[in-house]
Amino acid sequence: SSAASDVYKRQKFLGSEAGVFPYVRGTRAHNRWKIHQTVIVNCPKEANAVALKILNAGVDSIEFQIVPETFSAEDLNTLLKDIHIPAVEITFSGSKTAHVAELVIAKIEKEQLPAEEVHINFCIDPLVKKLTSKGSFCSENGAKCFEKIADLVRKTKTYKGIRVITVSGEIFSNAGSTIVEALAFSLAAGHDYLVRLMDMGFTIEEAAKKIRFSQAITSNYFMEIAKLRAGRMLWANIVKAYNPAKNCPCKMFTHAVTSTWNQTAYDPYVNMLRGTTEAMSASIAGVHSLEVTPFNKAYEDPNEFSMRIARNVELLLKHESHFDQVVDPAGGSYYIENLTDSIANEAWKLFREIEEKGGYTAAYESGFIVERVKASAAAKDKNIATRREILLGANQYPNFTEVAGKELTEAAVTRPVSEGNTLAPYRGSMAFEAMRLHVDRSGKAPKAFMLTCGSLAMARARAQFSCNFFACAGIKVIDNTFFKSIEEGVKAALESKAEIVVVCASDDDYAEAAPKVKELLGDKAILVVAGAPACMPELEAQGIKNFINVKSNVLETLKFYLKEMGI
């Protein structure tokens, strides 16, 4: 890895420019990325109508995600009716993509479209989409898949604008990987494809130019800018090692899509804000195309409104903020250059580790890749349960008055099981949402009452903390400015019929206040003390057992109280 670092440091400041190897600053001398949106194809005719509409609304890169298992040449003609192929980039994903690719190639050959005017991508990805997600190739050891890929690469040799393979890097991110893992594993899968294609007789140039990378962008703003910059540099060096005649094949062709891992199903409009900062990261770093995930994707099929907002984020970044007018504005920023360097180093280390195991396929088969991602996901889950990591609207600052609508189903908040050596996408907020949905649908309306007393400033601070704490489970919080006496507070608490009463005061007040509340309250409600006062052992000795504070595992603690209330 020190070699990679030296390479990077040498290349970093030597008047590095966009469009010049190793492409840290971009593969082109401009930053005109394409605005990408996905249309789900159940019925080709309906999908065509949606496509024409969004193409008129500023989209210049369209993805057709094909759902039906059978798809004919006639279906393809219906789907592409009135779409001028040279005017737009088209991507095909979903079921039977290799079969669809055959149909597409036949169509463009029949229509004799000039090769340089065709810009088409296929999301064929047996290594990540099949092997890593499903646990196996479509056929024994994948021989069939790779023969098919080789056939498509041969057929599209003259079409520089057709990319056959898309490395689905978002699968790692959306299963909970770290930024470094997502990059290293994507590079390793890309390298595996290169090696396989060269083994099948293709040159490095022919192989590299058929590979497209797709990456998820999370809300970790600066790290994501650095990831995309580091990725270009590392991929350029990987391809360069095979001595291509020119540098052009060393350019990483990258599509970015905003993350689904951090999307929340409660308070979903916050997802619009996440998508915005993520789109900014991608457009500052420079990508070929960018898709902002519609804000409601977590719980329903995107609709006209959510798709329009998603497009408008990018249209605004271009037409109002002019992000497309500047290339790599982050270049030369000490902070971002250093981050790029450290991500490049860490990702290169991990890439080398995979190569030492025999490449991506071997590393996957040994369990290394999936175990790595699952360990990262488990660490993130713990961070979210304990609020080391924040997901707005889920584990912090929830919308107090929100009740789940009928569009929010149990399926939307249930984490998919990833059997054995496979990765399944999930969302970081699912555990909180499943708990809250259970409360929303329980037919009960549990309440938590804030008994604020003692010193006013501390009482308010503790009440604010406690309200946010209990509201995360959909428990109705009753906040109170301040009670002059504990008797007055307990009387109001009993009148509210709240199942939980939270004493909110300063640490010094608790030794006296908490036992008094307990005495007056009896067993008519669950008593909770907000904080971790020094007198905790004495209070526990008096039977006061419940404390919430910044060290609490919010998720487990809330589940405990729900159980106590019989919900």
Segment roles from a protein language model:
Residues 92-282, 295-311:
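Helix-rich catalytic cores of soluble enzyme domains
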